[in-house]
Amino acid sequence: MLKEDENADIQVFESADQPSFLSCGIQSYLEDISSSLDDLHYASVDSYKAQGVNIHTNSTVTDLDTDNKTVVVEHQGQTATYSYDKLFLSPGGKPVTPPVDGIEKYKHVLFMRGRDWANQIKERMKDAKKAVVVGGGYIGIEAAEAFAKAGIDTTIVDVADRILNTYLDKEFTDILETNAQQHGLHFKGGETVKSISGNQNGEVTTVVTDKNEYDADTVLFAVGVEPATEWLKDKIDLGKKGIININHQQQTSAKDVYAGGDATLVPFAPVSEDRYIALATNSRRQGVVAAKNMLGKEMTMPRVSGTSGLQLFDYKFGQTGIHGTEIDNYDGNLGQTYVEELIRPQFMQDDTKIHMKIIYDKDTHRILGGQVMSKEDITASINTISVVISAGFTLEQLAVQDFFFQPDYDRPWHYLNVLAQQALGDTFGSDKMLF
């Protein structure tokens, strides 16, 4: 906003003691890659002030009056009222606390969200011997991998029957689970945690599910996030689970009030609907769109595909768009093709494979989603599939799309060409390449 209007009076209220903490970097801190949590901040109080922003830390917005255009802020036990011309809300999300008996009763029961929790987890890792991580999504496997690498006997427990079930299809997660087991990380799927018990010192000792009991001196819950919007009830329109209702210009139901981040939906590119996709990349785009519209310069939030990538032990993977598990919910005829392909020509004496899947409409051949995985870092190629989805490409277009060839990196038919060709059943000789 300041680039558009250098005289704008911008007040930022942050409930934490430091702004812009990147929770996605917690694993690097737990594994001693990042030496300090201070490294995991996208911005600082000083950097905000240097740009002319009035930043207020340890300040929680507790009330909103859209008629009089004011917010109430609590800081160190004192409250103050601020007026606004335009307001942007980004209350974010908070860890879901599942209905588990004993979850708030015992020591060493942790959540992986935010700077304070990161400190507690790192401190606990010094003494932990046996951990249970509840939740097999991105956050759960990041914590579990860090525990396992630290020599902690770690088990992931999830209600789903496989890890990362909302991100990757079974062909990929089967490989990841086997590889994780080889690194000492165990997975127990299809189980619901019912209770936690502990000893007379108030320390957790056991996790009880509907099927088993697991000894544990440390338990970490990572079962998702939910919008932190209770204080906005009856102030602006909220949807299911407290998600803030917005249009594609980031406007809420109240005049001059905009919103973005983990408390909102984003327009989904593969199909015409809005979805809850809590990613930092989406939040940044929403911030730009909101700022433009707040300044009277109309801009619409682009459709996104929920593109993301991660690493679990030996494998790097990326995913975007629709998954094969959505076949029953897709309004059409959903097709999916899984392919394993050598990355380089055989004469390079390198048998590294890439595992790939493409999701598409069987009738129109429009590409709707994709997944890639390898021991080599090919995750950036998922960005290509994301662009393809947004551009409305068909299998026929991707099958012959222009990619460079250099034997150090790929083959004459790029692996994404091969993926689309295999889906079409028209391989142009790519299935019989001698190199």
Where in the sequence are the language-model features?
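FAD-site-proximal beta/loop scaffold in flavoenzymes
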Residues: K105-A128, E203, E213-V289, V388
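Rossmann-like dinucleotide-binding cores of NAD(P)H-dependent redox enzymes
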Residues: L40, G140-S195, T281-S283, M299-T325
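Beta1-alpha1 glycine-rich phosphate/pyrophosphate-binding loop at the start
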Residues: M1-N54, Y138, A146-L168
